[in-house]
Amino acid sequence: MKEIKVIIAGPRGRMGHEAVLLMERTEHFNLVAAVDYKHGGEKISDLPGMPALDTPIYGDLHTCLEEVEADVLLDLTTPEVGKQHVTLAVERGLRSVIGTTGFTEEELKQLTETAKEKAVGTIIAPNFAIGAVLMMKFSQMAAKYFQDVEVIELHHDQKLDAPSGTAVKTVELIRQNRESKQQGHPNEVEQLEGARGANVDGIHIHSVRLPGLIAHQEVMFGGDGQMLTVRHDSFNRASFMSGVKLSIETVMNLDHLVYGLENIID
């Protein structure tokens, strides 16, 4: 396979660290630069626990793009920074794979239009784990037969956004196969505000944040005398790397924006 030159934004994070290791062990990936505002001017090898790579680190993406030629930006930063980075990448005509979440419908619409106008491949993935993508697909299938459903997502306590992008995407897919319905008793009252979680078209989403967790989600469907639970667990960040690899390889052949890994797997 032809060499793919990659910039990683957010190499110090746990996902970023796994992504650097992915670059090192994948023959056709070439990590040409990294972006980290705290370590501009250093090299990847200067960061604790990183492999001995001479890859330069830039303090901001704008400067990096001025000096480095790349094929793909892999962004694993925070929601706010990720939004800035993907906007800049699309405007510059640089393909990007975005692993941050928190995009609004309006932001996605604008990015989709710009990516189409610029004919630049872009993938925004709420979850890179193939198993999580299958969980979403299975939930979408089940929604045709079970109208009563709630979502519980559980993540580490350093996650900034709630609910997770995976939970939001799951509900979007479920709604495609489910008529609008308010889940629960029509006269139910929350004795404590937020006790029933977020409500999206009658589907309740509950977010758990605790140390010791990585990324987990279960979708619970209830019916007369039965219950169906679809669950996925990521026990470490290595579970996301197959999806990252697939996304980087796939985005090279795209000329538009794709939201969700489920849209690039068979």
UniProtKB/Swiss-Prot annotation:
Subcellular location: Cytoplasm
Binding-site residues, NAD(+): 10-15, 99-101, 125-128
Active-site residues annotated for this sequence: 155, 159
Protein's UniProt keywords contain Amino-acid biosynthesis: yes
Stored Pfam families: DapB_C (PF05173), DapB_N (PF01113)
Binding-site list for (S)-2,3,4,5-tetrahydrodipicolinate: 156, 165-166
Catalytic activity: (S)-2,3,4,5-tetrahydrodipicolinate + NAD(+) + H2O = (2S,4S)-4-hydroxy-2,3,4,5-tetrahydrodipicolinate + NADH + H(+); (S)-2,3,4,5-tetrahydrodipicolinate + NADP(+) + H2O = (2S,4S)-4-hydroxy-2,3,4,5-tetrahydrodipicolinate + NADPH + H(+)
InterPro entries xref list: DapB_C, DapB_N, DapB_N_CS, DHDPR_bac, NAD(P)-bd_dom_sf
GO cellular component: cytosol
Pathway recorded for this protein: Amino-acid biosynthesis; L-lysine biosynthesis via DAP pathway; (S)-tetrahydrodipicolinate from L-aspartate: step 4/4
UniProt-recorded Gene Ontology molecular function terms: 4-hydroxy-tetrahydrodipicolinate reductase; NAD binding; NADP binding; oxidoreductase activity, acting on CH or CH2 groups, NAD or NADP as acceptor
Keywords assigned: Amino-acid biosynthesis, Cytoplasm, Diaminopimelate biosynthesis, Lysine biosynthesis, NAD, NADP, Oxidoreductase
Xref: Gene3D superfamilies: Dihydrodipicolinate Reductase, domain 2, NAD(P)-binding Rossmann-like Domain
Segments crossing the lipid bilayer: none
Keyword Ligase: no
Protein family per UniProt: Belongs to the DapB family.
NCBIfam families: dapB
Role description: Catalyzes the conversion of 4-hydroxy-tetrahydrodipicolinate (HTPA) to tetrahydrodipicolinate.
This protein's name: 4-hydroxy-tetrahydrodipicolinate reductase
Source organism: Bacillus cereus (strain AH187)
Gene: dapB
